[in-house]
Design a protein with these regions (language model features):
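Long, C-terminal-biased catalytic regions of enzyme "large/alpha" subunits
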Residues: 1-221
């Protein structure tokens, strides 16, 4: 992470420079800022070998409203965090299941085509979130720190919109690849606190194994 580069793109320079990130490093923050995060599971947006952009836009727009509402429903640990969070109203909409999407599209992760799809999908998410945030600014007002004399971008509800989180735990619950990362193993073993071992099998591999007739419990363990 390069803090000087990040500060060049600071959306609210009138409030000061970035000094930190949130715990996983995906969102730059001013002193006392916080950010509400959420992840869209891209595994659910493949249809007939293509990305279902119509449904994806609907979900992004809904998620933008939900994440913005969380700010107002939140309980903040100290007054300074509440004050800064309400000033900038940052949200961080991310993804998980990118590799799942590419598998369903039959596109290798890391290929030129795979990178093109990832870029197109994230730009689409970013644009749809910005569009909805601009609409929310017209309905409820822009984030309070917005200054039309300093900020050249169109008024919007949230100073930040997208952020790619690792989703290491929630992706396990959703049974998809974490964040924008590839699957690093076909079969994984998760050791839980009570000493149990959970065997986690890649569902796409299991489907192929069953279809081609080489599936067995021994293979999966």
């Amino acid at each position: 992470l390069f803090i000087d580069t990040a500060n060049k793109d600071n959306m609210t320079p009138q409030l000061g420079d970035f000094e930190a990130t949130n715990p996983c490093g995906e969102q730059w923050l001013l002193p006392y800022e916080s950010c509400n995060l959420g992840s869209i599971n891209l595994a659910n947006f493949a249809i007939k070998g293509k990305v279902d952009y119509e449904r994806l836009k609907e979900i992004v727009r809904t998620a933008t409203v939900f994440l913005d509402n969380v700010i107002d429903c939140n309980r903040f640990p100290i007054p300074e965090i509440k004050e800064m969070t309400l000033k900038t109203r940052k949200i961080g909409m991310g993804i998980m299941g990118l590799h799942d999407l590419l598998i369903q599209l039959k596109i290798p992760y890391g290929s030129d085509q795979g990178r093109d799809v990832a870029s197109k999908v994230m730009k689409f998410i970013r644009d749809a979130a910005e569009e909805r945030s601009i609409e929310l600014a017209k309905e409820k007002g822009p984030f309070p720190a917005y200054d039309s004399t300093l900020n050249t971008y169109q008024p919007r509800r949230n100073a930040a919109l997208t952020s790619i989180q690792p989703t290491g735990t929630v992706s396990m619950i959703a049974d998809c690849a974490s964040g924008c990362e590839p699957y690093f193993s076909i079969v994984m073993v998760k050791h839980v606190m009570d000493g149990d071992r959970l065997i986690m099998v890649n569902r796409y591999f299991e489907q192929v194994a069953r279809k081609e007739g080489f599936y067995s419990a021994e293979l999966m363990s």
